[in-house]
A protein has these predicted regions:
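Extracytoplasmic
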Residues: 2-247
Length: 247
C-alpha cells in the first residue's frame, strides 16, 4: 500500500521579463497550472534550431503560436476551417506509430510537438519520482483527439474515465510520445494500489522517454522544455519536440 500526499502550495517557474509581451495562455498552455516559460522557451528553440522550411505537426491549440512565434509552417491552428484536415491530424496521433509515420512523411512533416501537464507527488518508487497526469495538456485532450478521429473510445479509454488503456499507451503515436509510463493504479480512499485499472483508482506514473535518439524509432525526442526535469516544482506543464525519422 502506498499513501500519497498532494501538495497544497506550488512554486512557479517563470522569468516575467521575458514573457511580458505574451498573452497569459501561452504562459500556462491554456491549463490552470502555474505560468512558466516552457512554451516560450520551446518556440524559441524551434525558431533557432530547425530549418526555416520545416513543417511542424501539433494539436490545433498550439499551431498559431508555432506559426507566429517560432515562424514555422504547421498543419492546423486556431484558424483552420477544414474539419477534414483537423480529423487527419487527430488520426495521426491515434494511429499506431508505423501508420502515423507513413502519414507524417506523406504530409512532409519534419517535427511533432506535444504538450503534457503533470503533478509530482510526495514519495518515490525506487528513486523515481511519481506523477499524476490529466492536468489539461494533450494527455487530457486525448479524448477529443479520439472523438475527432472517430475511433472506438472503449479501445483507448478505461470505462467512464479519461484514463488511457494499455492499448492507448503502447499502440498509439500520442501514447508513445507522452514521456510517462503508468506504474500502478491507486485508490486514495482505500489507500490500495493495483497493477491493473480498477474503478475508483488513479494512474500513477513515472517519467520514461520512449523515443530517444539511440534507436530505430519513427520519431526521436530532440527537445524537452525546462519544467520536465525541474524537481523543485510540483504542478507543471512541459513541451516536447520530436523529429520525424526520415530514414
Amino acid at each position: 500500500f502506498i499513501l500519497f500526499t498532494i501538495p497544497l502550495v506550488y512554486p512557479t517557474n517563470i522569468n516575467w521579463i521575458s514573457s511580458v509581451d505574451f498573452p497569459p495562455t501561452i504562459l500556462n498552455g491554456g491549463t490552470s497550472y502555474p505560468p512558466s516559460n516552457d512554451w516560450l522557451e520551446t518556440l524559441e528553440w524551434i525558431k533557432l534550431n530547425t530549418p526555416e522550411d520545416s513543417v511542424v505537426a501539433s494539436w490545433w491549440d498550439y499551431g498559431y503560436w508555432i506559426s507566429t512565434v517560432a515562424e514555422r509552417t504547421t498543419l492546423i491552428d486556431n484558424a483552420t476551417l477544414s474539419d477534414w484536415q483537423i480529423q487527419k491530424v487527430a488520426e495521426i496521433f491515434m494511429s499506431t506509430p508505423d501508420e502515423a509515420w507513413n502519414l507524417l512523411t506523406t504530409w512532409n512533416v519534419d517535427y511533432v510537438v506535444v504538450y503534457v501537464a503533470a503533478q509530482r507527488l510526495d514519495g518515490d518508487w525506487n528513486g523515481d519520482s511519481l506523477y499524476v497526469l490529466n492536468g489539461g495538456g494533450d494527455e487530457s485532450k486525448k479524448s477529443w483527439f479520439m472523438r475527432i478521429a472517430d475511433v472506438e473510445l472503449s479501445k483507448y479509454l478505461e470505462s467512464n474515465t479519461n484514463f488511457g488503456t494499455n492499448y492507448f499507451w503502447n499502440e498509439t503515436l500520442l501514447g508513445k510520445m507522452i514521456p510517462y509510463n503508468t506504474l500502478l493504479y491507486y485508490n486514495e480512499e482505500t489507500q490500495q494500489s493495483y497493477d491493473i485499472f480498477q474503478p475508483g483508482t488513479v494512474p500513477i506514473s513515472i517519467q520514461e522517454i520512449n523515443y530517444n535518439d539511440d534507436g530505430n524509432y519513427p520519431l526521436k525526442l530532440v527537445h524537452t522544455s525546462p519544467s520536465f526535469t525541474n524537481k523543485n516544482i510540483e504542478r507543471f506543464s512541459a513541451v516536447f519536440v520530436y523529429e520525424v525519422n526520415k530514414n
